[in-house]
Swiss-Prot record:
This is 1-deoxy-D-xylulose 5-phosphate reductoisomerase. The keyword Oxidoreductase applies. Mn(2+) binds at residues 138, 140, 208. One of its GO terms (biological process) is isopentenyl diphosphate biosynthetic process, methylerythritol 4-phosphate pathway involved in terpenoid biosynthetic process. It comes from Thermus thermophilus (strain ATCC 27634 / DSM 579 / HB8). Keywords: Isoprene biosynthesis, Manganese, Metal-binding, NADP, Oxidoreductase.
């Protein structure tokens, strides 16, 4: 029986990962969560994990509900003996647990794009030193991973990420009118609040461009974004002969989570009628309407700590927007200001965490 650790178990990806584990009959040996007491309690009762990590404020109540429960840090949960760790703690808070999982040599099903964006070269160095696998969970990166299988690297001309365009692709004309409630209504995907807002600004796609750059170790200038409102084509690989290879499928994250858990096998799943839309549109992104995508590309050109800084600043800016402190168009403005002020230094674990802390404070100044 495959043993799995789920980091970020009460979030959207974490809960869907547990659904997949239940369907596949896997053993969940560790859970790491935040402050959602009721959801975590249900998971503990169902899975009876060996170790659990949660915010310290929950410890007393968890001990009262589950007297024999062993509490630990997220890093300790990540280091448990298991075949796979699902790394789904959002933001840079998920970086240290992801690193801990990689250092134990297990497969890491990576849903935390910020970890790869901020620390890609460092994580790959750790993975190669410890014999770990890093497989993508993001639908677009899983699509590219699948489309690249069996292909020679020198035959690949471009990697193409698709974006639905979010809820504001065409309206309202004035994005200053956008409220948090409007931004949290994504037309296609079931996701957590932060990534839903990032999808609305297209910064999520910018992070995915940077993730693809680091995950596939591929030149930034050959990674493209196309708006695809139907969200049925998840990623395309363009080859030097002009041909394209695409991965298509329904907008169900469980498929991509499952693939990261079962690869190289595909688990048999009940098939439904093919829901192929009548029309598949592909449009160039409007960088004037969605400048956050342009900021991400600029961070990628600078590389290293610039990617750390914009990722950290975005967490602060999105939270400020959700709290009603700043208007929607202010998010990319804050990212651009922080990027311009980012120091140029070599990327190390020490400089990464230092710039992460600096960028958050810098973003708060502008928020």
């Amino acid at each position: 029986m495959k043993r799995v650790v789920v980091l970020g178990s009460t979030g959207s990806i974490g809960q869907q990962a547990l659904e997949v584990c239940r369907l596949r009959g896997y053993e969940v040996v560790g859970l790491a969560a935040g402050k959602n007491l009721e959801a975590l309690s249900r998971q503990i009762a169902l899975w009876k994990p060996r170790l659990v990590a949660a915010e310290e404020s929950l410890h007393k109540e968890l001990k009262a509900r589950f007297p024999g429960l062993r509490l630990a840090t997220a890093e300790e949960v990540a280091a448990l003996e298991a075949e796979v760790a699902v790394a789904a703690i959002p933001g840079l808070a998920g970086l240290a647990p992801t690193r801990a999982a990689v250092r134990t040599g297990k497969r890491v099903a990576l849903a935390n794009k910020e970890a790869m964006v901020a620390a890609g070269p460092l994580l790959w160095r750790e993975a190669e030193a410890h014999g770990a696998e890093i497989l993508p969970v993001d639908s677009e990166h899983s699509a590219l991973f699948q489309a690249l299988l069996g292909e020679r690297r020198e035959d690949v001309a471009e990697l193409i990420l698709t974006a639905s365009g979010g809820p504001f692709l065409r309206e309202p004309e004035d994005l200053a009118q956008v409220t948090p409630e409007m931004a949290l209504r994504h037309p296609r995907w079931r996701m957590g609040p932060k990534v839903t807002v990032d999808s609305a600004t297209l910064f999520n796609k910018g992070l995915e461009v940077l993730e693809a750059k680091e995950l596939f170790r591929f030149p930034l200038e050959r990674i493209k974004v196309l708006i695809h409102p139907q969200a049925y084509v998840h990623g395309l690989v363009r080859f030097v002969d002009g041909s394209l290879k695409a991965q298509l499928g329904p907008t169900d994250m469980r498929l991509f989570i499952q693939y990261a858990l079962t690869y190289p096998e595909r688990a048999e799943t009940p098939l439904k009628d093919l829901p192929i839309p009548g029309v598949l549109e592909f449009l160039e992104p409007d960088l004037k309407r969605f400048p956050a995508l342009a900021v991400a590309y600029e961070a990628g050109r600078r590389g290293g700590l610039a990617q750390v800084a914009v990722s950290a600043a975005d967490e602060v800016a999105v939270e400020a927007f959700l709290q009603g402190k700043i208007p929607f168009p202010r998010i990319p403005e804050i990212l651009a200001r922080v990027l311009e002020a980012t120091p140029i230094e070599p990327l190390t674990w020490e400089s990464l965490f230092a710039v992460d802390a600096w960028a958050r404070e810098e973003a708060k100044r502008w928020a």
